[in-house]
Amino acid sequence: MRDLNYDLKQLCRHNRDGSFATQADREHILDLIANQLHEMGFRHMNAHSLKPKHVEKLIERWLAESLSAGTIKNRMSALRWWAQKTGKENIIARSNAAYDIPDRVYVTNVSKARELAIAAIEGIRTESIKISLQLQAAFGLRREESIKIIPKWADRGDRLVLKDSWTKGGRTREIPISTPEQRQLVDEAKVVAKGKSLIPSRFATYVDYLKHFRYECERIGIHAFHGHRHFYAQGRYRELTGRECPARGGPTSKQLTREQKVIDHQARVAISHEMGHGREQITAVYLGR
């Protein structure tokens, strides 16, 4: 392991800011950054070697790779965390605009849904990961929820019940089991989990398993997971309203009749609750408006 990779790993281990998932994501991003700096010719660095030229070269590379604004901003957050922990916060501009990083676009009428390809899923070697990915798309679960869920406990026949300890914000919620495909998937999940969560017994902690989970997904080309929640939201909207959402080419809110607007609002409220959001407005991110 190179010095910089080791130093950043130790920096993360000694500074436990945020949730377990946040810590794991940060460590993963910083390891990637260390590798990219090495590839760009910056050798023999340590955690205290970060300079403005390194930041500028990294951003130049990310922009050239046409990464999404959200991905770049997440990496910038990790860079700022690194700089702050080593007393060098002043070497990075406070605003991403200083580096011509575009603003993140939250609401569009373009679908970001990701349909899980059967061939890609079959390339995953850990059965519990296959199930988790399918649960994300079939029920709109977040990554952490799809891993921590205990299928036997969650299955209430006509719905899935998520414990507060599994969910973001600690909010218990229920998601309908409304199709034969969903029912079959829940039954498969119960067989794989054997009465426990979808974390295999050989992994000591959630964080240990999360690293393996991420590695397996990246190996087959899955680098982000939120698209699976988009897929659920858009399919659920179609089920509740009988039409496609704006992000899938359906009519926008301005094109709906008064009666259709009532149905649209009711569907968005239901989907918002099923996905663990407190506000109907957030559904515009998944469905368009």
Feature annotation, model-predicted:
Residues 9-104:
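N-terminal core-binding DNA-recognition domain of tyrosine recombinases/integrases
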Residues 100-119, 169-181:
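DNA breakage-rejoining catalytic core of tyrosine-based enzymes
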Residues 114-143, 262-268:
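Basic, Lys/Arg- and aromatic-enriched nucleic-acid-binding interface segment
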Residues 135-159, 284-285:
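Short, charged phosphate-coordinating catalytic segments
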Residues 148-186:
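Conserved tyrosine-mediated DNA breakage-rejoining catalytic core shared by Y-recombinases
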Residues 159-165, 249-289:
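Short functional hotspots where side chains directly engage DNA or cofactors
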Residues 178-241:
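Active-site/catalytic core of tyrosine-dependent DNA strand-transfer enzymes
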Residues 221-265, 277:
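Short basic/aromatic active-site micro-motif
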